[in-house]
Regions:
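C-terminal functional extensions of proteins
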Residues: 3-38, 294-296, 303-491
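Residues at the starts of beta-strands that form the adenosine-phosphate
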Residues: 259, 287-291, 409
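Gly/Ser/Thr-rich loops at beta-strand to alpha-helix junctions
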Residues: 134-138, 263-272, 297-299, 380-385
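Conserved structured core elements
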Residues: 48, 137, 241, 271-275, ...
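Histidine-anchored nucleotide/phosphate-binding helix
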Residues: 269-291
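Structural motif
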Residues: 259-261, 373-374
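Non-catalytic accessory regions outside enzyme or core folds
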Residues: 2-259, 444, 449-491
Protein backbone atom coordinates (compact mmCIF):
# COMPACT_ATOMS: atom_id res chain seq x y z
CA UNK A 1 0.00 0.00 0.00
CA UNK A 2 1.38 3.40 -0.89
CA UNK A 3 1.79 5.90 1.94
CA UNK A 4 -0.89 8.55 2.25
CA UNK A 5 0.60 12.05 2.13
CA UNK A 6 -0.94 15.22 3.46
CA UNK A 7 0.40 18.76 3.42
CA UNK A 8 0.37 20.48 6.80
CA UNK A 9 -0.05 24.18 7.54
CA UNK A 10 3.66 24.75 7.04
CA UNK A 11 3.58 23.32 3.54
CA UNK A 12 5.45 20.16 4.57
CA UNK A 13 4.50 16.76 3.18
CA UNK A 14 3.79 14.39 6.06
CA UNK A 15 2.98 10.71 5.76
CA UNK A 16 -0.11 9.54 7.64
CA UNK A 17 0.27 5.86 6.78
CA UNK A 18 3.30 3.66 7.20
CA UNK A 19 4.74 2.01 4.12
CA UNK A 20 4.58 -1.76 4.18
CA UNK A 21 7.69 -3.85 4.14
CA UNK A 22 8.51 -5.70 0.94
CA UNK A 23 10.26 -8.46 2.89
CA UNK A 24 9.24 -12.04 2.27
CA UNK A 25 11.42 -13.87 4.79
CA UNK A 26 9.55 -12.93 7.96
CA UNK A 27 8.15 -16.01 9.66
CA UNK A 28 4.68 -16.90 10.86
CA UNK A 29 4.24 -17.89 14.47
CA UNK A 30 5.56 -16.64 17.81
CA UNK A 31 9.20 -16.26 18.80
CA UNK A 32 10.53 -19.76 19.56
CA UNK A 33 11.57 -20.67 23.05
CA UNK A 34 15.29 -20.37 23.84
CA UNK A 35 15.80 -17.52 21.38
CA UNK A 36 15.98 -13.75 21.47
CA UNK A 37 12.77 -11.81 21.05
CA UNK A 38 12.59 -10.59 17.46
CA UNK A 39 10.21 -8.87 15.09
CA UNK A 40 11.04 -11.56 12.56
CA UNK A 41 8.19 -13.65 14.00
CA UNK A 42 4.83 -12.26 12.98
CA UNK A 43 2.87 -13.54 15.98
CA UNK A 44 5.24 -11.95 18.47
CA UNK A 45 4.59 -8.78 20.42
CA UNK A 46 7.92 -7.57 19.01
CA UNK A 47 6.53 -7.70 15.45
CA UNK A 48 3.34 -5.90 16.48
CA UNK A 49 5.36 -3.17 18.18
CA UNK A 50 7.72 -2.61 15.27
CA UNK A 51 5.06 -2.85 12.57
CA UNK A 52 2.34 -0.75 14.18
CA UNK A 53 3.25 0.88 17.48
CA UNK A 54 6.61 2.46 16.67
CA UNK A 55 5.47 4.17 13.44
CA UNK A 56 2.53 5.57 15.42
CA UNK A 57 4.85 6.88 18.12
CA UNK A 58 7.06 8.55 15.53
CA UNK A 59 4.01 10.17 13.97
CA UNK A 60 3.04 11.52 17.39
CA UNK A 61 6.52 13.01 17.79
CA UNK A 62 6.13 14.73 14.42
CA UNK A 63 2.78 16.20 15.39
CA UNK A 64 4.16 17.34 18.76
CA UNK A 65 6.94 19.45 17.23
CA UNK A 66 4.68 20.75 14.45
CA UNK A 67 1.99 21.79 16.92
CA UNK A 68 4.59 23.38 19.20
CA UNK A 69 6.07 25.45 16.38
CA UNK A 70 4.36 28.75 17.36
CA UNK A 71 5.66 28.40 20.92
CA UNK A 72 9.11 27.45 19.65
CA UNK A 73 9.18 30.44 17.29
CA UNK A 74 8.26 32.73 20.16
CA UNK A 75 11.13 31.30 22.22
CA UNK A 76 13.86 30.90 19.58
CA UNK A 77 12.74 33.01 16.62
CA UNK A 78 11.82 32.02 13.07
CA UNK A 79 15.11 30.19 12.53
CA UNK A 80 13.79 27.29 14.63
CA UNK A 81 11.52 26.41 11.68
CA UNK A 82 14.56 24.94 9.93
CA UNK A 83 15.27 22.71 12.92
CA UNK A 84 11.68 21.51 13.04
CA UNK A 85 11.62 20.74 9.31
CA UNK A 86 14.87 18.80 9.50
CA UNK A 87 13.61 16.80 12.48
CA UNK A 88 10.31 16.00 10.74
CA UNK A 89 12.12 14.92 7.59
CA UNK A 90 14.55 12.76 9.58
CA UNK A 91 11.73 11.00 11.46
CA UNK A 92 9.90 10.35 8.18
CA UNK A 93 13.07 8.75 6.79
CA UNK A 94 13.41 6.65 9.94
CA UNK A 95 9.83 5.42 9.53
CA UNK A 96 10.65 4.40 5.96
CA UNK A 97 13.82 2.61 7.10
CA UNK A 98 11.84 0.71 9.73
CA UNK A 99 9.03 -0.36 7.44
CA UNK A 100 11.48 -1.48 4.75
CA UNK A 101 13.60 -3.31 7.32
CA UNK A 102 16.74 -1.40 6.45
CA UNK A 103 20.17 -1.76 8.06
CA UNK A 104 20.95 0.17 11.24
CA UNK A 105 23.06 3.27 10.59
CA UNK A 106 26.04 4.55 12.55
CA UNK A 107 25.81 7.76 14.59
CA UNK A 108 27.88 10.68 13.28
CA UNK A 109 26.63 13.70 15.21
CA UNK A 110 27.03 15.22 18.67
CA UNK A 111 25.76 12.17 20.55
CA UNK A 112 27.92 11.74 23.69
CA UNK A 113 27.47 7.96 23.52
CA UNK A 114 28.03 7.53 19.77
CA UNK A 115 31.32 5.64 20.21
CA UNK A 116 29.62 2.99 22.36
CA UNK A 117 26.63 2.75 20.02
CA UNK A 118 28.77 2.53 16.88
CA UNK A 119 30.98 -0.15 18.43
CA UNK A 120 27.89 -2.14 19.37
CA UNK A 121 26.34 -1.79 15.90
CA UNK A 122 29.61 -2.78 14.21
CA UNK A 123 29.87 -5.96 16.28
CA UNK A 124 26.35 -7.15 15.44
CA UNK A 125 26.28 -9.99 12.89
CA UNK A 126 25.19 -8.55 9.54
CA UNK A 127 21.91 -10.54 9.46
CA UNK A 128 21.04 -9.04 12.86
CA UNK A 129 21.46 -5.39 11.85
CA UNK A 130 17.96 -4.74 10.50
CA UNK A 131 14.86 -3.82 12.46
CA UNK A 132 12.84 -7.02 12.09
CA UNK A 133 15.76 -9.46 12.07
CA UNK A 134 17.56 -7.95 15.04
CA UNK A 135 16.82 -8.68 18.66
CA UNK A 136 13.73 -6.63 19.55
CA UNK A 137 15.59 -4.88 22.38
CA UNK A 138 18.32 -3.76 19.97
CA UNK A 139 15.85 -2.51 17.36
CA UNK A 140 13.63 -0.69 19.83
CA UNK A 141 16.49 1.00 21.70
CA UNK A 142 18.06 2.00 18.39
CA UNK A 143 14.81 3.65 17.28
CA UNK A 144 14.46 5.74 20.44
CA UNK A 145 18.13 6.67 20.32
CA UNK A 146 17.88 7.79 16.69
CA UNK A 147 14.75 9.85 17.42
CA UNK A 148 16.48 11.86 20.12
CA UNK A 149 19.64 12.22 18.02
CA UNK A 150 17.61 14.30 15.55
CA UNK A 151 16.86 16.79 18.32
CA UNK A 152 20.33 16.48 19.83
CA UNK A 153 21.98 17.54 16.57
CA UNK A 154 19.67 20.49 15.95
CA UNK A 155 20.66 24.09 16.62
CA UNK A 156 17.91 25.05 19.05
CA UNK A 157 16.14 21.86 20.19
CA UNK A 158 19.05 19.75 21.47
CA UNK A 159 17.42 19.52 24.95
CA UNK A 160 13.84 19.13 23.73
CA UNK A 161 11.90 16.27 25.37
CA UNK A 162 9.18 15.35 22.90
CA UNK A 163 7.48 13.21 25.58
CA UNK A 164 7.56 15.52 28.60
CA UNK A 165 3.98 16.74 28.13
CA UNK A 166 2.69 13.16 28.38
CA UNK A 167 4.52 12.53 31.66
CA UNK A 168 3.34 15.83 33.11
CA UNK A 169 -0.27 15.26 32.05
CA UNK A 170 -0.18 11.80 33.62
CA UNK A 171 0.72 13.33 36.97
CA UNK A 172 -1.74 16.23 36.73
CA UNK A 173 -4.76 14.02 35.94
CA UNK A 174 -3.86 11.79 38.93
CA UNK A 175 -4.32 14.60 41.45
CA UNK A 176 -7.11 12.99 43.46
CA UNK A 177 -5.33 9.65 43.58
CA UNK A 178 -2.14 11.35 44.77
CA UNK A 179 -4.06 13.04 47.59
CA UNK A 180 -5.55 9.74 48.74
CA UNK A 181 -2.23 7.89 48.59
CA UNK A 182 -0.37 10.72 50.32
CA UNK A 183 -2.82 10.88 53.23
CA UNK A 184 -2.88 7.10 53.64
CA UNK A 185 0.90 6.83 53.89
CA UNK A 186 1.74 9.51 56.45
CA UNK A 187 3.52 8.15 59.54
CA UNK A 188 3.05 4.48 58.64
CA UNK A 189 4.64 2.22 61.29
CA UNK A 190 7.68 0.16 60.30
CA UNK A 191 6.18 -3.27 59.67
CA UNK A 192 6.55 -5.85 56.95
CA UNK A 193 2.80 -5.69 56.35
CA UNK A 194 2.95 -1.98 55.48
CA UNK A 195 6.09 -2.45 53.38
CA UNK A 196 4.42 -5.28 51.47
CA UNK A 197 1.33 -3.18 50.78
CA UNK A 198 3.46 -0.30 49.47
CA UNK A 199 5.34 -2.69 47.17
CA UNK A 200 2.07 -3.95 45.70
CA UNK A 201 0.66 -0.45 45.21
CA UNK A 202 3.93 0.52 43.56
CA UNK A 203 3.92 -2.55 41.31
CA UNK A 204 0.39 -1.94 40.04
CA UNK A 205 0.56 1.86 40.02
CA UNK A 206 -0.06 2.14 36.26
CA UNK A 207 -3.52 0.61 36.90
CA UNK A 208 -4.04 2.09 40.34
CA UNK A 209 -5.49 5.47 39.38
CA UNK A 210 -8.19 3.89 37.20
CA UNK A 211 -9.04 1.19 39.73
CA UNK A 212 -9.28 3.68 42.57
CA UNK A 213 -11.60 5.87 40.54
CA UNK A 214 -13.96 2.94 39.98
CA UNK A 215 -13.83 1.61 43.54
CA UNK A 216 -16.83 2.13 45.82
CA UNK A 217 -15.77 2.76 49.41
CA UNK A 218 -17.97 1.58 52.24
CA UNK A 219 -18.29 3.44 55.54
CA UNK A 220 -15.85 0.94 57.03
CA UNK A 221 -13.33 1.59 54.25
CA UNK A 222 -11.97 5.14 54.47
CA UNK A 223 -9.94 6.38 51.52
CA UNK A 224 -6.93 7.09 53.69
CA UNK A 225 -6.57 3.45 54.79
CA UNK A 226 -3.46 1.76 53.39
CA UNK A 227 -5.17 -1.65 53.76
CA UNK A 228 -8.01 -0.58 51.47
CA UNK A 229 -5.63 0.95 48.94
CA UNK A 230 -3.60 -2.25 48.79
CA UNK A 231 -6.82 -4.19 48.17
CA UNK A 232 -7.76 -1.79 45.38
CA UNK A 233 -4.32 -2.18 43.82
CA UNK A 234 -4.79 -5.96 43.70
CA UNK A 235 -8.17 -5.87 41.93
CA UNK A 236 -8.08 -8.17 38.89
CA UNK A 237 -4.30 -8.50 39.22
CA UNK A 238 -2.25 -11.63 39.93
CA UNK A 239 1.15 -11.64 41.60
CA UNK A 240 2.85 -14.72 40.15
CA UNK A 241 6.04 -14.50 42.21
CA UNK A 242 6.17 -12.60 45.49
CA UNK A 243 9.59 -12.39 47.14
CA UNK A 244 8.63 -9.38 49.26
CA UNK A 245 9.69 -11.17 52.44
CA UNK A 246 13.18 -11.70 51.05
CA UNK A 247 13.43 -8.04 50.03
CA UNK A 248 12.32 -6.95 53.52
CA UNK A 249 14.78 -9.31 55.21
CA UNK A 250 17.59 -8.00 53.02
CA UNK A 251 16.83 -4.43 54.10
CA UNK A 252 16.46 -5.42 57.77
CA UNK A 253 19.84 -7.15 58.04
CA UNK A 254 22.26 -5.22 60.27
CA UNK A 255 25.32 -3.76 58.61
CA UNK A 256 27.08 -0.52 57.77
CA UNK A 257 25.88 -0.22 54.17
CA UNK A 258 22.25 0.79 53.84
CA UNK A 259 22.30 2.32 50.36
CA UNK A 260 19.56 1.26 47.94
CA UNK A 261 19.90 1.79 44.19
CA UNK A 262 16.55 2.30 42.50
CA UNK A 263 16.63 1.90 38.73
CA UNK A 264 13.58 3.92 37.72
CA UNK A 265 11.01 3.24 35.04
CA UNK A 266 8.29 5.79 34.25
CA UNK A 267 7.65 9.38 35.22
CA UNK A 268 4.21 10.80 35.96
CA UNK A 269 2.11 9.09 38.61
CA UNK A 270 4.41 6.05 38.66
CA UNK A 271 7.30 8.18 39.90
CA UNK A 272 4.99 9.63 42.57
CA UNK A 273 4.26 6.08 43.74
CA UNK A 274 7.98 5.29 43.62
CA UNK A 275 8.72 8.24 45.89
CA UNK A 276 6.04 7.20 48.39
CA UNK A 277 7.77 3.81 48.69
CA UNK A 278 11.28 5.25 48.86
CA UNK A 279 10.24 7.89 51.41
CA UNK A 280 8.91 5.08 53.62
CA UNK A 281 12.19 3.20 53.31
CA UNK A 282 14.29 6.23 54.27
CA UNK A 283 11.97 7.34 57.09
CA UNK A 284 12.10 3.88 58.66
CA UNK A 285 15.84 3.29 58.22
CA UNK A 286 15.32 0.52 55.71
CA UNK A 287 17.70 2.57 53.59
CA UNK A 288 20.24 5.15 54.72
CA UNK A 289 20.23 6.60 51.20
CA UNK A 290 18.37 5.92 47.97
CA UNK A 291 20.07 6.59 44.63
CA UNK A 292 17.67 7.21 41.75
CA UNK A 293 18.99 6.02 38.39
CA UNK A 294 17.16 7.94 35.67
CA UNK A 295 17.48 8.05 31.88
CA UNK A 296 20.05 10.34 30.28
CA UNK A 297 17.71 11.23 27.38
CA UNK A 298 13.97 11.09 26.60
CA UNK A 299 13.31 7.37 26.37
CA UNK A 300 10.45 4.94 25.68
CA UNK A 301 7.87 7.74 25.84
CA UNK A 302 7.34 7.81 29.61
CA UNK A 303 10.72 6.98 31.16
CA UNK A 304 11.97 9.23 33.94
CA UNK A 305 14.72 11.82 33.35
CA UNK A 306 16.35 14.29 35.73
CA UNK A 307 14.20 17.20 34.46
CA UNK A 308 11.11 15.04 35.15
CA UNK A 309 12.22 14.61 38.77
CA UNK A 310 12.77 18.36 39.16
CA UNK A 311 9.47 19.22 37.48
CA UNK A 312 7.55 16.76 39.68
CA UNK A 313 9.00 18.08 42.94
CA UNK A 314 8.39 21.68 41.87
CA UNK A 315 4.81 20.87 40.81
CA UNK A 316 4.06 19.32 44.20
CA UNK A 317 5.78 22.05 46.22
CA UNK A 318 3.60 24.71 44.59
CA UNK A 319 0.40 22.65 44.58
CA UNK A 320 -2.65 24.32 46.13
CA UNK A 321 -3.49 21.21 48.13
CA UNK A 322 -1.78 21.46 51.50
CA UNK A 323 -1.03 17.75 51.78
CA UNK A 324 0.58 17.50 48.34
CA UNK A 325 2.50 20.73 48.86
CA UNK A 326 3.82 19.51 52.22
CA UNK A 327 4.78 16.21 50.61
CA UNK A 328 6.64 17.98 47.82
CA UNK A 329 8.54 20.08 50.35
CA UNK A 330 9.44 16.99 52.36
CA UNK A 331 10.76 15.22 49.26
CA UNK A 332 12.74 18.34 48.35
CA UNK A 333 14.32 18.20 51.83
CA UNK A 334 15.13 14.51 51.43
CA UNK A 335 16.89 15.35 48.17
CA UNK A 336 18.72 18.40 49.55
CA UNK A 337 19.89 16.36 52.57
CA UNK A 338 20.96 13.57 50.16
CA UNK A 339 18.74 10.96 51.76
CA UNK A 340 17.45 10.54 48.19
CA UNK A 341 19.84 11.48 45.41
CA UNK A 342 19.85 11.36 41.63
CA UNK A 343 22.78 9.19 40.63
CA UNK A 344 25.24 10.53 38.04
CA UNK A 345 23.69 10.09 34.61
CA UNK A 346 24.84 7.02 32.70
CA UNK A 347 24.11 6.39 29.03
CA UNK A 348 24.29 2.66 29.77
CA UNK A 349 20.63 2.79 30.83
CA UNK A 350 19.73 4.05 27.32
CA UNK A 351 21.99 1.64 25.50
CA UNK A 352 20.97 -1.62 23.80
CA UNK A 353 23.04 -3.95 25.98
CA UNK A 354 21.63 -6.45 28.48
CA UNK A 355 22.75 -5.89 32.03
CA UNK A 356 25.04 -8.89 32.24
CA UNK A 357 27.57 -7.03 30.03
CA UNK A 358 27.67 -3.99 32.36
CA UNK A 359 30.83 -5.21 34.06
CA UNK A 360 32.63 -5.03 30.70
CA UNK A 361 30.97 -2.03 29.06
CA UNK A 362 30.52 0.30 32.06
CA UNK A 363 32.67 -0.87 34.95
CA UNK A 364 32.20 2.39 36.87
CA UNK A 365 28.42 1.98 36.96
CA UNK A 366 28.85 -1.65 37.98
CA UNK A 367 31.11 -0.56 40.86
CA UNK A 368 28.47 1.94 41.99
CA UNK A 369 25.93 -0.88 42.29
CA UNK A 370 28.37 -3.07 44.22
CA UNK A 371 28.46 -0.39 46.93
CA UNK A 372 24.76 -0.74 47.75
CA UNK A 373 22.83 -3.21 49.83
CA UNK A 374 20.07 -3.68 47.26
CA UNK A 375 19.36 -2.70 43.67
CA UNK A 376 15.67 -2.54 42.72
CA UNK A 377 14.95 -2.73 39.00
CA UNK A 378 11.52 -1.34 38.20
CA UNK A 379 9.41 -2.04 35.13
CA UNK A 380 9.21 -4.22 32.06
CA UNK A 381 12.12 -2.75 30.09
CA UNK A 382 14.52 -3.19 33.00
CA UNK A 383 13.30 -6.77 33.33
CA UNK A 384 13.93 -7.43 29.64
CA UNK A 385 17.47 -6.12 30.01
CA UNK A 386 18.04 -8.25 33.09
CA UNK A 387 16.92 -11.29 31.09
CA UNK A 388 18.75 -10.25 27.90
CA UNK A 389 15.43 -10.16 25.95
CA UNK A 390 15.71 -13.95 25.82
CA UNK A 391 12.85 -16.42 26.04
CA UNK A 392 13.90 -18.61 28.93
CA UNK A 393 11.96 -21.58 30.23
CA UNK A 394 9.42 -19.91 32.49
CA UNK A 395 10.46 -22.15 35.41
CA UNK A 396 14.14 -21.28 35.09
CA UNK A 397 15.62 -19.68 38.20
CA UNK A 398 15.77 -15.90 38.29
CA UNK A 399 19.45 -15.97 39.27
CA UNK A 400 20.32 -18.24 36.33
CA UNK A 401 18.66 -15.88 33.86
CA UNK A 402 20.75 -12.96 35.16
CA UNK A 403 23.77 -14.71 33.59
CA UNK A 404 26.25 -13.65 36.21
CA UNK A 405 24.95 -10.12 36.76
CA UNK A 406 25.24 -9.94 40.55
CA UNK A 407 26.79 -6.62 41.61
CA UNK A 408 24.63 -6.69 44.76
CA UNK A 409 21.35 -8.13 46.01
CA UNK A 410 18.77 -7.68 43.26
CA UNK A 411 15.01 -7.16 43.25
CA UNK A 412 12.98 -6.93 40.04
CA UNK A 413 9.45 -5.49 40.18
CA UNK A 414 7.57 -5.76 36.94
CA UNK A 415 4.15 -6.23 35.37
CA UNK A 416 4.39 -8.81 32.59
CA UNK A 417 4.07 -7.08 29.20
CA UNK A 418 6.09 -9.33 26.89
CA UNK A 419 7.11 -12.96 26.47
CA UNK A 420 10.17 -12.78 28.75
CA UNK A 421 9.53 -14.27 32.19
CA UNK A 422 11.26 -16.68 34.57
CA UNK A 423 11.10 -18.05 38.09
CA UNK A 424 7.54 -19.45 37.83
CA UNK A 425 6.55 -22.83 39.30
CA UNK A 426 6.73 -25.68 36.81
CA UNK A 427 3.64 -25.81 34.59
CA UNK A 428 2.24 -22.44 35.65
CA UNK A 429 2.91 -20.70 32.31
CA UNK A 430 1.10 -23.42 30.35
CA UNK A 431 -1.90 -23.25 32.65
CA UNK A 432 -1.98 -19.47 32.41
CA UNK A 433 -1.91 -19.67 28.62
CA UNK A 434 -4.87 -22.06 28.55
CA UNK A 435 -6.91 -19.66 30.70
CA UNK A 436 -5.72 -16.32 29.27
CA UNK A 437 -3.87 -16.26 25.95
CA UNK A 438 -2.93 -12.59 26.51
CA UNK A 439 -1.40 -13.10 29.94
CA UNK A 440 2.14 -12.26 28.79
CA UNK A 441 1.24 -8.87 27.30
CA UNK A 442 -1.81 -7.70 29.28
CA UNK A 443 -0.02 -6.17 32.26
CA UNK A 444 -2.48 -7.96 34.55
CA UNK A 445 0.18 -10.27 35.99
CA UNK A 446 3.27 -9.26 37.91
CA UNK A 447 6.35 -10.48 39.71
CA UNK A 448 8.42 -9.28 42.65
CA UNK A 449 11.59 -11.35 42.38
CA UNK A 450 14.70 -11.31 44.54
CA UNK A 451 18.10 -12.96 44.57
CA UNK A 452 20.95 -12.61 47.00
CA UNK A 453 24.27 -11.63 45.46
CA UNK A 454 25.97 -14.62 47.10
CA UNK A 455 23.29 -17.20 46.34
CA UNK A 456 24.34 -20.23 44.35
CA UNK A 457 22.34 -21.22 41.26
CA UNK A 458 20.92 -24.44 42.65
CA UNK A 459 17.42 -25.54 43.58
CA UNK A 460 16.21 -25.61 47.17
CA UNK A 461 13.41 -28.19 47.27
CA UNK A 462 10.51 -27.89 49.62
CA UNK A 463 10.43 -24.12 49.88
CA UNK A 464 7.17 -22.47 49.08
CA UNK A 465 6.76 -19.71 46.52
CA UNK A 466 5.00 -16.98 48.45
CA UNK A 467 1.93 -16.56 46.22
CA UNK A 468 -1.46 -15.55 47.52
CA UNK A 469 -3.60 -18.68 47.30
CA UNK A 470 -6.87 -16.84 46.68
CA UNK A 471 -5.64 -15.85 43.23
CA UNK A 472 -5.24 -19.43 42.08
CA UNK A 473 -8.48 -21.46 41.94
CA UNK A 474 -9.05 -20.70 38.24
CA UNK A 475 -5.39 -21.08 37.32
CA UNK A 476 -3.22 -23.67 39.03
CA UNK A 477 -2.40 -24.52 42.59
CA UNK A 478 1.07 -23.22 43.49
CA UNK A 479 3.74 -25.80 44.06
CA UNK A 480 7.32 -25.61 45.26
CA UNK A 481 9.02 -22.49 44.02
CA UNK A 482 12.64 -21.45 43.82
CA UNK A 483 12.84 -18.58 46.25
CA UNK A 484 15.53 -18.97 48.88
CA UNK A 485 16.09 -17.72 52.35
CA UNK A 486 13.70 -17.35 55.27
CA UNK A 487 10.07 -16.85 54.39
CA UNK A 488 9.36 -15.17 57.73
CA UNK A 489 9.82 -11.39 57.96
CA UNK A 490 12.60 -10.16 60.24
CA UNK A 491 11.44 -7.76 62.91
Amino acid sequence: MSPQIRVNKMGWRISTHSERSTNTDLMEGPTPRHSLLSGRYKQSFAYLTLRSRMPGIMQQVIMRVVNDLPMLEEKFGEEVRKDVKQIVDAIERLKMELNRDRQFLQFHGNEPDKAEWNAFLSELPRPKRTFFRACWLHAECYLYRRIFSFFENSRFLHNFDCFDHLKQEDLIISEETMKILAKATRDLPKTFDNFHKLLRINLWCNHFEIQLGAFTFTEEEPQNDINVLAKVADIDRVLLVNDSVLVWNCLMKPGPNGIVDYICDNGGFEFFADMVLLEYMVDNNLATQVRLHVKAIPWYISDLTRPDVEWTINYLVHHEDECLSALGKKWARLISSEKIVIAPVSHFWTGPQPYFVMVESDIELYRVLTNSRLAIFKGDLNYRKLMGDYIWDSAEEFITCLRGFRPTNICAMRTVKCEVVCGLPEGMADTLLRNDHTWMISGSYGVIQYTDSLKCSCAFPGEENNIKSEHWPALVQPRSGRSTGAQTPIG
